[in-house]
Amino acid sequence: MARRSVFTLLALAMSAAAAAACADQPTAPATVASALRDRQAPPDPAEIRHVRQLAAQHGIGPLPAAPHVSEPLARLGQALMFDRILSGNRDMACSTCHLPEYGTSDGRSLPIGADGIGFGPSRMLGQGSVIPRNSPAVLDIASLRHMFLDGRVEVDANGRFHTPAGAQLTPAMTRVLQFGALSAQPMFPPTSTAEMRGHPAPGNELARIPDDSLDAIWAAIMKRLMAIPQYRAMFRAAYPGTPLTQLTFAHASNAIAGFIATRFHFANSPWDRFLAGDDRALTQQQLDGAQTFLTIKCVQCHNGPTLSDDQFHNVAVAQIGPGEGNGPSLHDDFGRMNVTGDPADLYRFRTSPLRNVELTAPYGHDGAIISLRAFIEHYSQSDQQLLNYDPSQLPAELQGTVLDNQAAILANRDTVIVGVVLTPDVVDKLMAYMQALTDPAARNLSSAIPRRVPSGLPVDRP
Protein backbone atom coordinates (compact mmCIF):
# COMPACT_ATOMS: atom_id res chain seq x y z
CA MET A 1 0.00 0.00 0.00
CA ALA A 2 2.79 2.44 0.90
CA ARG A 3 4.53 1.74 -2.42
CA ARG A 4 1.27 2.26 -4.32
CA SER A 5 0.74 5.61 -2.51
CA VAL A 6 4.16 6.84 -3.53
CA PHE A 7 3.51 5.94 -7.17
CA THR A 8 0.14 7.71 -6.93
CA LEU A 9 1.83 10.83 -5.58
CA LEU A 10 4.45 10.64 -8.33
CA ALA A 11 1.72 10.47 -10.93
CA LEU A 12 -0.07 13.44 -9.35
CA ALA A 13 3.13 15.45 -9.29
CA MET A 14 3.94 14.62 -12.92
CA SER A 15 0.40 15.51 -14.00
CA ALA A 16 0.59 18.84 -12.15
CA ALA A 17 3.93 19.63 -13.74
CA ALA A 18 2.57 18.85 -17.21
CA ALA A 19 -0.47 21.05 -16.60
CA ALA A 20 1.76 23.88 -15.43
CA ALA A 21 3.85 23.61 -18.59
CA CYS A 22 0.74 24.11 -20.72
CA ALA A 23 -0.75 26.93 -18.65
CA ASP A 24 -0.65 30.56 -19.74
CA GLN A 25 0.86 31.64 -16.39
CA PRO A 26 3.98 30.03 -14.86
CA THR A 27 3.31 27.77 -11.91
CA ALA A 28 5.75 26.55 -9.27
CA PRO A 29 6.83 23.03 -10.23
CA ALA A 30 5.11 20.25 -8.32
CA THR A 31 7.31 17.77 -6.51
CA VAL A 32 6.84 14.59 -4.55
CA ALA A 33 7.74 16.61 -1.45
CA SER A 34 5.02 19.19 -2.09
CA ALA A 35 2.48 16.48 -2.84
CA LEU A 36 3.35 14.72 0.40
CA ARG A 37 3.10 18.01 2.28
CA ASP A 38 -0.35 18.65 0.83
CA ARG A 39 -1.49 15.22 2.00
CA GLN A 40 0.10 15.64 5.44
CA ALA A 41 -2.24 16.21 8.37
CA PRO A 42 -1.78 19.56 10.13
CA PRO A 43 0.20 19.55 13.37
CA ASP A 44 -1.52 18.96 16.69
CA PRO A 45 -4.22 21.64 17.21
CA ALA A 46 -3.43 21.91 20.91
CA GLU A 47 0.23 22.60 20.14
CA ILE A 48 -0.77 25.17 17.52
CA ARG A 49 -2.90 27.03 20.07
CA HIS A 50 -0.15 26.83 22.69
CA VAL A 51 2.52 28.23 20.38
CA ARG A 52 0.29 31.12 19.33
CA GLN A 53 -0.47 31.88 22.98
CA LEU A 54 3.23 31.83 23.89
CA ALA A 55 4.08 34.08 20.96
CA ALA A 56 1.43 36.58 22.02
CA GLN A 57 2.73 36.56 25.60
CA HIS A 58 6.14 37.66 24.35
CA GLY A 59 4.85 40.29 21.94
CA ILE A 60 5.81 38.19 18.94
CA GLY A 61 3.36 39.18 16.27
CA PRO A 62 3.38 40.45 12.70
CA LEU A 63 6.01 42.97 11.67
CA PRO A 64 4.85 46.57 11.65
CA ALA A 65 3.85 47.54 8.14
CA ALA A 66 6.56 49.07 6.02
CA PRO A 67 6.44 52.87 6.19
CA HIS A 68 5.07 54.81 3.28
CA VAL A 69 7.94 55.92 1.07
CA SER A 70 7.37 57.93 -2.07
CA GLU A 71 8.65 56.37 -5.27
CA PRO A 72 11.09 59.23 -5.97
CA LEU A 73 12.56 58.94 -2.47
CA ALA A 74 12.98 55.17 -2.79
CA ARG A 75 14.64 55.54 -6.22
CA LEU A 76 17.05 58.11 -4.80
CA GLY A 77 17.83 55.86 -1.84
CA GLN A 78 18.49 52.88 -4.09
CA ALA A 79 20.90 54.88 -6.24
CA LEU A 80 22.76 56.23 -3.22
CA MET A 81 23.04 52.83 -1.54
CA PHE A 82 24.74 51.31 -4.58
CA ASP A 83 26.79 54.32 -5.69
CA ARG A 84 30.50 54.42 -4.90
CA ILE A 85 30.38 58.22 -5.02
CA LEU A 86 29.76 58.20 -1.25
CA SER A 87 33.22 56.77 -0.54
CA GLY A 88 36.36 58.86 -0.39
CA ASN A 89 38.24 57.12 -3.19
CA ARG A 90 35.04 56.22 -5.07
CA ASP A 91 35.91 52.54 -4.70
CA MET A 92 33.05 51.16 -2.59
CA ALA A 93 29.38 51.73 -1.86
CA CYS A 94 27.16 51.05 1.13
CA SER A 95 26.19 47.89 -0.76
CA THR A 96 29.79 46.64 -0.78
CA CYS A 97 29.25 45.55 2.83
CA HIS A 98 25.47 45.04 2.47
CA LEU A 99 25.19 42.87 -0.61
CA PRO A 100 21.74 41.61 -1.64
CA GLU A 101 23.22 38.25 -2.66
CA TYR A 102 24.41 37.70 0.93
CA GLY A 103 21.20 38.63 2.70
CA THR A 104 22.34 42.29 2.85
CA SER A 105 25.47 41.34 4.76
CA ASP A 106 28.67 40.47 2.88
CA GLY A 107 29.27 36.78 3.59
CA ARG A 108 32.44 37.55 5.54
CA SER A 109 33.22 37.24 9.24
CA LEU A 110 34.68 40.74 9.14
CA PRO A 111 34.33 43.21 6.28
CA ILE A 112 37.16 44.88 4.42
CA GLY A 113 36.59 48.60 4.21
CA ALA A 114 37.84 51.40 2.00
CA ASP A 115 40.66 50.65 -0.44
CA GLY A 116 39.85 46.93 -0.55
CA ILE A 117 39.40 45.08 -3.83
CA GLY A 118 36.32 43.18 -4.97
CA PHE A 119 33.29 42.31 -2.86
CA GLY A 120 31.75 39.47 -0.89
CA PRO A 121 33.77 36.59 0.60
CA SER A 122 36.43 37.00 -2.10
CA ARG A 123 37.07 40.69 -1.32
CA MET A 124 40.80 41.28 -0.86
CA LEU A 125 42.57 43.62 1.53
CA GLY A 126 44.49 45.70 -1.01
CA GLN A 127 45.41 48.89 0.84
CA GLY A 128 42.33 48.60 3.04
CA SER A 129 41.62 47.61 6.62
CA VAL A 130 39.70 44.79 8.25
CA ILE A 131 36.67 46.28 10.01
CA PRO A 132 36.37 45.08 13.64
CA ARG A 133 32.73 44.00 13.53
CA ASN A 134 30.56 41.83 11.33
CA SER A 135 28.48 43.65 8.74
CA PRO A 136 24.91 43.43 10.08
CA ALA A 137 22.11 42.63 7.65
CA VAL A 138 19.55 45.35 7.00
CA LEU A 139 16.53 43.07 6.52
CA ASP A 140 13.44 44.08 8.52
CA ILE A 141 15.24 46.56 10.77
CA ALA A 142 13.12 49.69 10.30
CA SER A 143 11.40 49.35 13.68
CA LEU A 144 14.61 49.05 15.74
CA ARG A 145 15.57 52.00 17.94
CA HIS A 146 19.28 51.13 18.04
CA MET A 147 21.54 50.96 15.00
CA PHE A 148 25.01 49.42 14.85
CA LEU A 149 25.95 46.49 17.06
CA ASP A 150 26.86 48.79 19.95
CA GLY A 151 23.75 50.96 19.52
CA ARG A 152 25.72 54.14 19.00
CA VAL A 153 22.92 55.53 16.86
CA GLU A 154 19.74 55.57 18.91
CA VAL A 155 16.33 57.18 19.05
CA ASP A 156 15.11 57.26 22.64
CA ALA A 157 11.56 56.87 23.89
CA ASN A 158 11.04 60.62 23.53
CA GLY A 159 12.14 60.63 19.89
CA ARG A 160 15.51 62.24 20.56
CA PHE A 161 18.51 61.15 18.48
CA HIS A 162 21.73 60.11 20.19
CA THR A 163 24.64 59.68 17.79
CA PRO A 164 28.44 60.04 17.65
CA ALA A 165 27.91 63.36 15.85
CA GLY A 166 26.56 65.12 18.91
CA ALA A 167 25.54 68.68 18.08
CA GLN A 168 26.85 68.33 14.50
CA LEU A 169 23.62 66.46 13.78
CA THR A 170 21.50 69.58 13.98
CA PRO A 171 17.79 69.86 14.79
CA ALA A 172 17.21 70.84 11.15
CA MET A 173 18.83 67.57 10.10
CA THR A 174 16.90 65.40 12.54
CA ARG A 175 13.63 66.88 11.29
CA VAL A 176 14.45 65.35 7.90
CA LEU A 177 14.92 61.84 9.34
CA GLN A 178 11.56 60.19 8.73
CA PHE A 179 12.38 56.59 9.59
CA GLY A 180 13.80 56.79 13.09
CA ALA A 181 17.25 55.49 13.91
CA LEU A 182 17.49 53.83 10.50
CA SER A 183 17.44 57.25 8.84
CA ALA A 184 20.51 58.37 10.79
CA GLN A 185 22.53 55.17 10.40
CA PRO A 186 23.80 55.75 6.81
CA MET A 187 25.32 59.09 7.84
CA PHE A 188 28.24 57.48 9.65
CA PRO A 189 30.08 54.85 7.54
CA PRO A 190 31.06 57.50 4.94
CA THR A 191 32.77 59.49 7.72
CA SER A 192 34.94 56.56 8.85
CA THR A 193 38.44 56.37 7.39
CA ALA A 194 38.47 52.58 7.68
CA GLU A 195 34.94 51.96 6.45
CA MET A 196 34.34 54.26 3.46
CA ARG A 197 36.23 57.57 3.62
CA GLY A 198 39.60 56.01 2.90
CA HIS A 199 43.10 57.39 3.09
CA PRO A 200 44.54 60.45 1.35
CA ALA A 201 44.92 59.96 -2.38
CA PRO A 202 44.48 62.10 -5.49
CA GLY A 203 40.80 62.96 -5.83
CA ASN A 204 39.90 62.05 -2.24
CA GLU A 205 39.06 65.41 -0.75
CA LEU A 206 37.11 63.68 2.05
CA ALA A 207 40.29 62.21 3.54
CA ARG A 208 41.79 65.67 4.02
CA ILE A 209 39.01 66.72 6.40
CA PRO A 210 39.70 66.23 10.14
CA ASP A 211 38.17 63.04 11.51
CA ASP A 212 35.94 64.83 13.99
CA SER A 213 34.52 67.32 11.45
CA LEU A 214 31.58 65.16 10.45
CA ASP A 215 29.57 68.14 9.26
CA ALA A 216 32.35 69.11 6.85
CA ILE A 217 32.58 65.53 5.53
CA TRP A 218 28.83 65.45 4.96
CA ALA A 219 28.96 68.80 3.17
CA ALA A 220 31.77 67.57 0.91
CA ILE A 221 29.77 64.47 -0.05
CA MET A 222 26.76 66.63 -0.88
CA LYS A 223 28.98 68.82 -3.05
CA ARG A 224 29.91 65.70 -5.02
CA LEU A 225 26.28 64.70 -5.41
CA MET A 226 25.09 68.16 -6.42
CA ALA A 227 27.71 68.23 -9.19
CA ILE A 228 25.83 65.39 -10.94
CA PRO A 229 22.78 66.61 -12.89
CA GLN A 230 20.83 63.36 -12.43
CA TYR A 231 21.25 63.52 -8.67
CA ARG A 232 20.06 67.12 -8.62
CA ALA A 233 16.92 66.02 -10.46
CA MET A 234 16.40 63.03 -8.17
CA PHE A 235 16.75 65.13 -5.00
CA ARG A 236 14.24 67.65 -6.38
CA ALA A 237 11.76 64.85 -7.05
CA ALA A 238 12.33 63.21 -3.65
CA TYR A 239 12.10 66.45 -1.68
CA PRO A 240 9.76 68.73 -3.65
CA GLY A 241 9.74 72.26 -2.33
CA THR A 242 13.18 72.01 -0.71
CA PRO A 243 15.75 74.20 -2.47
CA LEU A 244 18.92 72.37 -3.43
CA THR A 245 20.89 74.85 -1.33
CA GLN A 246 19.07 73.62 1.79
CA LEU A 247 19.79 69.95 1.24
CA THR A 248 22.15 68.23 3.67
CA PHE A 249 23.52 64.72 3.87
CA ALA A 250 20.61 63.97 6.21
CA HIS A 251 18.38 64.08 3.13
CA ALA A 252 20.61 61.51 1.40
CA SER A 253 20.77 59.28 4.48
CA ASN A 254 17.01 59.46 4.91
CA ALA A 255 16.51 58.38 1.30
CA ILE A 256 18.77 55.35 1.79
CA ALA A 257 16.76 54.45 4.89
CA GLY A 258 13.49 54.78 2.99
CA PHE A 259 14.75 52.39 0.33
CA ILE A 260 15.92 49.89 2.97
CA ALA A 261 12.69 50.13 4.97
CA THR A 262 10.54 49.23 1.97
CA ARG A 263 12.68 47.09 -0.34
CA PHE A 264 14.05 44.92 2.46
CA HIS A 265 10.78 44.51 4.35
CA PHE A 266 9.64 40.87 4.35
CA ALA A 267 6.54 39.69 6.17
CA ASN A 268 5.46 36.50 4.39
CA SER A 269 7.56 33.80 6.02
CA PRO A 270 5.94 30.52 7.10
CA TRP A 271 6.04 31.95 10.63
CA ASP A 272 4.11 35.04 9.51
CA ARG A 273 1.51 32.86 7.83
CA PHE A 274 1.24 30.75 10.97
CA LEU A 275 0.71 33.82 13.15
CA ALA A 276 -1.97 34.96 10.68
CA GLY A 277 -3.93 31.75 11.26
CA ASP A 278 -2.61 29.26 8.70
CA ASP A 279 -2.45 26.00 10.66
CA ARG A 280 -0.49 24.28 7.88
CA ALA A 281 2.17 26.97 7.46
CA LEU A 282 4.70 25.18 9.69
CA THR A 283 5.89 21.62 9.50
CA GLN A 284 5.63 19.58 12.68
CA GLN A 285 9.37 19.99 13.27
CA GLN A 286 9.15 23.76 12.78
CA LEU A 287 6.22 23.95 15.19
CA ASP A 288 8.14 21.88 17.74
CA GLY A 289 11.08 24.23 17.26
CA ALA A 290 8.87 27.27 17.80
CA GLN A 291 7.48 25.78 21.00
CA THR A 292 11.00 24.99 22.22
CA PHE A 293 12.20 28.49 21.33
CA LEU A 294 9.29 30.04 23.23
CA THR A 295 9.69 27.91 26.35
CA ILE A 296 13.45 27.99 26.90
CA LYS A 297 15.64 31.04 27.37
CA CYS A 298 15.90 32.08 23.69
CA VAL A 299 12.78 34.20 23.95
CA GLN A 300 14.09 36.26 26.86
CA CYS A 301 16.23 38.23 24.37
CA HIS A 302 14.68 37.30 21.02
CA ASN A 303 11.15 38.61 21.36
CA GLY A 304 8.84 41.13 19.74
CA PRO A 305 7.96 41.19 16.03
CA THR A 306 11.61 41.23 14.87
CA LEU A 307 12.61 38.57 17.43
CA SER A 308 15.00 41.04 19.03
CA ASP A 309 14.51 42.92 22.29
CA ASP A 310 16.66 45.69 20.75
CA GLN A 311 18.81 45.58 23.89
CA PHE A 312 22.39 44.56 24.63
CA HIS A 313 23.76 41.27 25.95
CA ASN A 314 27.04 39.46 26.46
CA VAL A 315 26.51 35.96 25.09
CA ALA A 316 30.13 34.81 25.35
CA VAL A 317 31.19 35.02 21.71
CA ALA A 318 34.94 34.71 21.07
CA GLN A 319 36.74 37.93 20.17
CA ILE A 320 38.52 37.83 16.82
CA GLY A 321 39.99 40.34 14.42
CA PRO A 322 41.60 43.74 15.02
CA GLY A 323 39.16 44.80 17.73
CA GLU A 324 38.10 48.33 18.58
CA GLY A 325 41.38 49.42 20.17
CA ASN A 326 40.25 48.39 23.65
CA GLY A 327 42.09 46.61 26.46
CA PRO A 328 45.83 46.12 27.03
CA SER A 329 46.24 44.41 23.66
CA LEU A 330 44.28 47.14 21.82
CA HIS A 331 42.60 44.25 19.98
CA ASP A 332 39.64 43.90 22.33
CA ASP A 333 36.12 45.17 21.70
CA PHE A 334 34.23 46.39 24.76
CA GLY A 335 30.95 46.63 22.85
CA ARG A 336 28.17 48.76 24.32
CA MET A 337 30.50 50.03 27.05
CA ASN A 338 32.32 52.07 24.39
CA VAL A 339 29.08 54.05 23.99
CA THR A 340 27.78 54.30 27.55
CA GLY A 341 30.97 54.13 29.60
CA ASP A 342 29.13 51.80 31.97
CA PRO A 343 31.20 48.74 33.05
CA ALA A 344 27.95 46.76 33.20
CA ASP A 345 27.84 47.04 29.40
CA LEU A 346 31.24 45.40 28.91
CA TYR A 347 31.13 42.95 25.95
CA ARG A 348 27.45 43.57 25.37
CA PHE A 349 26.13 43.83 21.82
CA ARG A 350 22.68 44.37 20.35
CA THR A 351 20.45 41.33 20.10
CA SER A 352 20.32 40.40 16.44
CA PRO A 353 16.87 40.20 14.82
CA LEU A 354 16.15 36.66 13.66
CA ARG A 355 13.91 37.22 10.65
CA ASN A 356 15.59 35.72 7.58
CA VAL A 357 18.54 34.85 9.81
CA GLU A 358 19.53 31.76 7.81
CA LEU A 359 20.50 34.06 4.93
CA THR A 360 22.91 36.26 6.89
CA ALA A 361 25.89 34.10 7.96
CA PRO A 362 28.39 34.42 9.63
CA TYR A 363 27.11 35.18 13.14
CA GLY A 364 28.15 37.01 16.29
CA HIS A 365 29.28 40.61 16.66
CA ASP A 366 32.54 39.71 14.93
CA GLY A 367 31.36 36.86 12.71
CA ALA A 368 33.26 34.38 14.85
CA ILE A 369 30.68 31.62 14.28
CA ILE A 370 30.36 30.60 10.66
CA SER A 371 27.13 28.59 10.46
CA LEU A 372 23.66 29.06 11.89
CA ARG A 373 23.64 25.58 13.36
CA ALA A 374 26.94 26.26 15.12
CA PHE A 375 25.54 29.51 16.50
CA ILE A 376 22.53 27.69 17.94
CA GLU A 377 24.88 25.10 19.43
CA HIS A 378 26.94 27.92 20.95
CA TYR A 379 24.13 28.55 23.43
CA SER A 380 24.42 25.01 24.80
CA GLN A 381 26.87 25.32 27.70
CA SER A 382 28.09 28.59 26.23
CA ASP A 383 30.91 29.01 28.76
CA GLN A 384 32.50 25.82 27.50
CA GLN A 385 31.76 26.75 23.92
CA LEU A 386 33.79 29.94 24.39
CA LEU A 387 36.65 28.18 26.16
CA ASN A 388 36.75 25.48 23.47
CA TYR A 389 36.26 27.83 20.51
CA ASP A 390 37.69 26.33 17.32
CA PRO A 391 39.33 28.99 15.12
CA SER A 392 39.72 26.53 12.23
CA GLN A 393 36.19 27.48 11.14
CA LEU A 394 37.50 30.97 10.29
CA PRO A 395 39.17 32.16 7.10
CA ALA A 396 42.91 31.54 7.30
CA GLU A 397 43.77 35.20 7.77
CA LEU A 398 41.65 35.40 10.94
CA GLN A 399 42.57 32.10 12.59
CA GLY A 400 45.49 33.60 14.49
CA THR A 401 43.53 36.60 15.79
CA VAL A 402 41.49 34.95 18.57
CA LEU A 403 42.02 37.08 21.67
CA ASP A 404 42.83 35.46 25.00
CA ASN A 405 40.19 37.37 26.95
CA GLN A 406 37.80 34.55 27.75
CA ALA A 407 37.97 35.07 31.52
CA ALA A 408 37.02 38.73 31.16
CA ILE A 409 34.11 37.87 28.86
CA LEU A 410 32.79 35.20 31.21
CA ALA A 411 33.10 37.50 34.22
CA ASN A 412 30.42 39.73 32.69
CA ARG A 413 28.40 37.39 30.48
CA ASP A 414 24.63 37.39 30.81
CA THR A 415 23.30 34.99 33.39
CA VAL A 416 20.30 34.26 31.16
CA ILE A 417 22.38 31.85 29.09
CA VAL A 418 23.81 29.98 32.07
CA GLY A 419 22.63 26.39 32.36
CA VAL A 420 21.23 26.04 28.85
CA VAL A 421 21.88 22.57 27.42
CA LEU A 422 20.63 21.69 23.94
CA THR A 423 20.49 18.12 22.68
CA PRO A 424 21.07 17.43 18.96
CA ASP A 425 17.33 16.83 18.56
CA VAL A 426 16.52 20.20 20.11
CA VAL A 427 19.10 21.88 17.87
CA ASP A 428 17.42 20.25 14.85
CA LYS A 429 14.05 21.65 15.92
CA LEU A 430 15.42 25.13 16.58
CA MET A 431 17.17 25.07 13.22
CA ALA A 432 13.88 24.15 11.53
CA TYR A 433 12.18 27.05 13.29
CA MET A 434 14.91 29.47 12.17
CA GLN A 435 14.28 28.36 8.59
CA ALA A 436 10.57 29.06 9.07
CA LEU A 437 11.50 32.71 9.68
CA THR A 438 12.67 33.12 6.08
CA ASP A 439 10.39 34.87 3.62
CA PRO A 440 10.87 33.16 0.23
CA ALA A 441 11.05 36.58 -1.40
CA ALA A 442 14.22 37.35 0.60
CA ARG A 443 16.14 34.50 -1.01
CA ASN A 444 16.77 36.35 -4.25
CA LEU A 445 17.29 40.09 -3.93
CA SER A 446 19.02 40.64 -7.26
CA SER A 447 16.22 42.93 -8.42
CA ALA A 448 17.22 45.41 -5.71
CA ILE A 449 20.47 46.14 -7.57
CA PRO A 450 20.19 49.02 -10.05
CA ARG A 451 21.58 48.57 -13.55
CA ARG A 452 23.52 51.80 -13.23
CA VAL A 453 23.93 54.73 -10.83
CA PRO A 454 24.02 58.47 -11.59
CA SER A 455 27.77 58.81 -11.01
CA GLY A 456 28.47 56.26 -13.74
CA LEU A 457 30.76 54.36 -11.37
CA PRO A 458 30.65 50.52 -11.39
CA VAL A 459 27.92 48.78 -9.40
CA ASP A 460 28.74 45.73 -7.25
CA ARG A 461 26.81 42.79 -8.70
CA PRO A 462 27.25 39.01 -8.75
Task: Please place each PLM-identified region on the residue numbering.
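Positively charged n-region of N-terminal signal peptides that target proteins for export
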Residues: 1-4
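Periplasmic c-type cytochrome electron-transfer domains
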Residues: 6, 21-462
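Bacterial N-terminal signal peptides
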Residues: 8-17
